[in-house]
């Protein structure tokens, strides 16, 4: 009996020694599988960041595979023979792509992850529109209080889906979509502009970005749980800076923004970088940070400690409405970037 008593006491002490909430990790679902960016490495890095905090358990749901055969390369202008061969090759490619799509139509329509098993979705998807069952389940999840965090090119998708456009407020859209959204530097609020307000018009009025570069993020709501303890200004590692995003500012709450410098092909305006919006009972956070392409060798945008902090805290807040995660050691300053592999970031208070 004494042995059993001691064993029970040791078990109790072990439980008391666990960090608060260690047995109740937030259940995260990452959606990926289609993207013009490197969705595989984005998911790997995102998953690593979230798991390194000790606050989350992460599952990945990958969309059915796309047609894998590469498109024929375009010939140089003026080569009539090469152009004729290219046209024939494209015709063949399009036929094969259509046949593949038709053969996998049922698989695509039936792709509906079990959203109810999770508390928050991290969206790393930018591809063809989902089937109706998937769209309905996704919408119902967020409407009923599930969290949603959209990363980088995720805001490029679903131009014609009204519910998604309401969730993200603004995204990468063409010049005829909604209003051009910027940030008023004096108030820190999102504002809708007309074409006449645009300072640089040489690149048109649709969404775009200039050259990748290091740029400063400016905190616009220091009191919000996601932003508490984050410097008023800090330097983000090399990334794309989206400009001229379009949509509606009606229910958009900006958390941070960046000035888009003309010398890097920017807009000469302050652009939203992190923002949130309610969607019925759900909380939706969107960030345009986090660029990586298949040909890129640098993880700077994803491994920036500032980005990792925003990602993890946004995910926690979207899921629970609260933030317990601290600002980790090595957070960037106004003068210096900070790029650290997710497994080496120190999240301890």
Model-derived regions: residue spans:
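Positively charged n-region of N-terminal signal peptides that target proteins for export
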Residues: 1-6
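Bacterial N-terminal signal peptides
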Residues: 8-19
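Extracellular ligand-binding/catalytic regions of CAZymes and related secreted enzymes
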Residues: 23-26, 41-42, 48-53, 62-86, ...
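Helical hinge/lid and interdomain linker segments adjacent to catalytic or ligand-binding clefts
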Residues: 27-31, 38-158
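Active-site rim elements
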Residues: 33-36, 126, 152, 202-205, ...
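Catalytic beta-strand/loop cores that center a nucleophilic Ser/Cys/Thr
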Residues: 51, 57, 105-106, 116-117, ...
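A glycine-rich, often tryptophan-bearing local segment used as a flexible ligand/cofactor-contacting loop or short
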Residues: 114, 123, 127-225
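Structural detector of well-ordered beta-strand residues that form the stable sheet scaffold
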Residues: 147-149, 255, 285
